[in-house]
Amino acid sequence: MQNIGFAAGSLIKGRWTVVKKIGQGAFGEIFSGKNIINNEQIAIKVEKVDTKKQVLRLEVAVLKKLQLCPYVCRFITCGRHNDYNYMVMELLGENLSELRRKQLDGKFSLGSTLKLGVQMIQSLQAVHDLGYLHRDVKPSNFAIGLNPSKRNITYLIDFGLARRFVLASGEVRPARESTGFRGTARYASINSHLSKDLGRRDDLWSIFYVLIEFAEGQLPWRKLKDKDQIGEMKQKYNTPDLVKDLPPQFSQFMKHLKSLNYEDRPNYVFLQTLLNDCYTSLGLSESTPFDWEVQTNSGASSSSSNTTQQQQQQQQQQQQRNLNQSGLNNSSARLMASPSTIDVEASGKSTQLNNSNNNNNNNNKGLGAENDSSPQPQIIRRNSESNSQIANSSESDNKGSGGGSWNQKSSSPRHKDKNLQDDGGEGSQKHLKASNNNNINNNNNNYNNNNNNNNNSHMNGNGSNSQPIDKIELSHQQQKSSTTKCCSTSKCSVM
């Protein structure tokens, strides 16, 4: 695409200043920036208003609904500036693709791979429970926090290819006979290569491929460029041999995914428990750092640093080999994936999501998994997913392109949503406390009940407002009144 041309030093709405371009995609560009009022570092995503395929509106809609999930980046504001639509969000650190390439042999230790897997599954479950598919799951669409206290948190980003997979009634949309390819060839599911309509299982197939690459440093089709050839090789390796050098939990993970049909809801708890059991069987604990968190003396040489990391990886690899030889017993021990506190900031303010890990009666003892000492995969096959379990709002058909202009003259209900208007950066984040005292199922029920009573306020709007997107501010009372939860994890409960 052509360079959008946001110059360094440009000022947006008298508050956000552009620093430099940090990324570019098919439909827009991303810049780092700064809030000139409080010096907060931000990211600004922009697209031209006359872009044929506008995706920013959809991304804003999804991101705003996920703001209570600890594994989704913080949304700040959105609007129009001159001939551009823009979205301001929290600036994050390196993505997982960059971090992996910095590791020895280009791979993560097994322990880090498993911890990452649990966080990624939890973030995808939150998206799915809102009724959306991500459809472009890959390492570069997960990034760690920029703040040192958040470098152990993985955030899901880039919802430009997201698609709503449920109807207003809560039923899963009928599968289309044929669709175009969606995603990134290396990590896309076989169904995507076959031009089949994608479901929740396909996002998890992408997670599966990502985890293999994290643990082994490569995928068998890494050298191929043609997506059709990649698809053929994926079908060839669609057997347990693909994970023969990994712990047996990976083959169980694969077996569950292969059992799912288009409309089925994956057993997220079962998948998290598999990874959690493998993690605890390695003798690792909650305090075990990610590979990139390993501390080295500032004066130590590069070779000394490499030796330390190499010893750590060799130790974990030896543990892995021992486990492969002897097999693993299911463990009831669980490890909490999130840190004890997670900062959530909004417009220069901050609060704490208190995730207490010391409650002996807490049913969520795993990396987000339920306390089930002998988990069995459960598959729900039905076209109706119950209105209380999937998203709440009535949606027009979304083809994955984000469709439509931010101009309020559009006839699509989605384009008249008052919640997508520019709020000037104030009050876009709800200050709520997360409780860790409810198990995952209770959280699902509470979240869904809230959704059903929310009158579809997040996405539908009343369609009566014809003002431009950057002229309408959300009142504090409007924002304060919404307590819809974004996901079913214990960390996202609303007190």
UniProtKB/Swiss-Prot annotation:
Residues 295-333, 354-364, 435-466 have a biased composition (Low complexity). Residues 293-469 are annotated as: Disordered. Coiled coil: none annotated. GO terms for biological process: protein phosphorylation; signal transduction. ATP binds at I22, G23, Q24, G25, A26, F27, G28, E29, I30, K45. GO terms for cellular component: cytoplasm; nucleus. Keywords: ATP-binding, Kinase, Nucleotide-binding, Serine/threonine-protein kinase, Transferase. SMART domains: S_TKc. Residues 385-395 have a biased composition (Polar residues). PROSITE patterns: PROTEIN_KINASE_ATP, PROTEIN_KINASE_DOM. Residues 16-275 form the Protein kinase domain. One of its GO terms (molecular function) is ATP binding. Belongs to the protein kinase superfamily. CK1 Ser/Thr protein kinase family. This is Probable serine/threonine-protein kinase DDB_G0292354. It comes from Dictyostelium discoideum (Social amoeba).
